[in-house]
């Protein structure tokens, strides 16, 4: 029996073949006690895994919290991508100004991603892929099996953006970061992902609203 097969059982009776003589005492080792034992074991295993593999999202927020955003060069402001076409294509309204305001920082965020990747703190494409997967799941909860998915996305684009923000925020809820650093960091990641077309839909030429 493999470890995966053993893990599928509701208790630990078959999980400890080397300790069967001890655990044969049904008065001491009840089904509930085995379940508690299994739960503690799994929690410890997850905790160790997280310690070995810290969250790329947390590493990014930590780096952003130490980033100076006051020294944006005029050349950076002039060369920044204008997301107006995509904002209009997706009918973004309440988050329109936020994205326009934060777009100027994309160059700094991209450089930060590259630096963190060189340090081995994150893998940029994996981080962005995770954000895209969050978007895909949230989009699915709105679109369901509709054949007119784009129209539904347009009707709910601001709610979808807010839901992605909330999910990223939720993943950092138990961290030691300041509230302000989490909000700023998640907004920067969100806007960068929007510009990279990891969130909401990429405009298609000749597709009129």
Positions of PLM-derived features:
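Histidine-centered nuclease catalytic patch
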Residues: 1-12, 22-42
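Short, cysteine/histidine-rich loop/knuckle motifs that typically chelate Zn2+
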Residues: 18
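Long, low-complexity, intrinsically disordered terminal regions
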Residues: 60-209
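The −1 position to Zn-ligating cysteines in a subset of zinc-ribbon hairpins
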Residues: 15
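Phenylalanine-focused residue identity feature
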Residues: 9, 29, 34, 50, ...
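Glycine- and acidic-residue-rich phosphate-binding/metal-coordinating active-site segment common to enzymes
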Residues: 33-80
């Amino acid at each position: 029996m493999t470890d995966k097969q053993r893990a599928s059982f509701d208790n630990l009776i078959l999980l400890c073949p080397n300790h069967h003589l001890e655990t044969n005492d049904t008065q001491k080792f009840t089904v509930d006690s085995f379940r508690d034992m299994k739960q503690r074991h799994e929690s410890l295993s997850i905790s160790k895994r997280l310690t070995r593999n810290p969250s790329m999202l947390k590493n990014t927020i930590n780096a952003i919290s130490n980033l100076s955003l006051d020294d944006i060069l005029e050349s950076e402001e002039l060369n920044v991508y204008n997301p107006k076409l995509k904002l209009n294509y997706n009918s973004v309204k309440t988050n329109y100004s936020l994205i326009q305001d934060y777009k100027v920082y994309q160059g700094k965020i991209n450089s930060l991603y590259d630096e963190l990747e060189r340090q081995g703190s994150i893998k940029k494409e994996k981080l962005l892929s995770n954000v895209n997967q969050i978007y895909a799941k949230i989009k699915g909860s709105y679109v369901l099996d509709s054949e007119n998915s784009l129209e539904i996305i347009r009707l709910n684009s601001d709610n979808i953006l807010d839901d992605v923000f909330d999910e990223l925020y939720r993943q950092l809820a138990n961290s030691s970061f300041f509230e302000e650093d989490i909000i700023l960091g998640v907004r920067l990641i969100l806007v960068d992902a929007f510009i990279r077309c990891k969130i909401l839909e990429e405009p298609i030429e000749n597709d009129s609203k």
